[in-house]
UniProtKB/Swiss-Prot annotation:
Taxonomic placement: Eukaryota, Metazoa, Ecdysozoa, Arthropoda, Chelicerata
A GO CC annotation given for this chain: extracellular region
Tissue: Expressed by the venom gland.
UniProt-recorded Gene Ontology molecular function terms: sodium channel regulator activity; toxin activity
Organism, as annotated: Tityus serrulatus (Brazilian scorpion)
Main location: secreted
The organism's place on the tree of life at top rank: Eukaryota
Protein name, UniProt field: Putative sodium channel toxin Ts36
Keyword terms: Disulfide bond, Ion channel impairing toxin, Neurotoxin, Secreted, Signal, Toxin, Voltage-gated sodium channel impairing toxin
Summary of the function given for this chain in its UniProt record: Putative sodium channel toxin.
InterPro entries, per database record: Scorpion_toxin-like_sf
Amino acid sequence: MFKLAIILAFLFLGARAVRDGYPILKNGCSCTCQPLLENPKCGAICKSKVGISKAYCYMWACRLILHRYSEEYRPY
């Protein structure tokens, strides 16, 4: 029972981290956003986030871009 509780807690926290944009997955959004600084939008966002690790910044930038894209082009 204790092991199950630990596993469920880990899955919950992992899902929350993915939702919030933390870099817990190695490839995160590599299929939807070009490598860091090769994409002008990612580069501009990441340069403004001084002091944050590149992995976090990359994930955050990709999630932000995807969110804006989905809001802008959502079919009604």
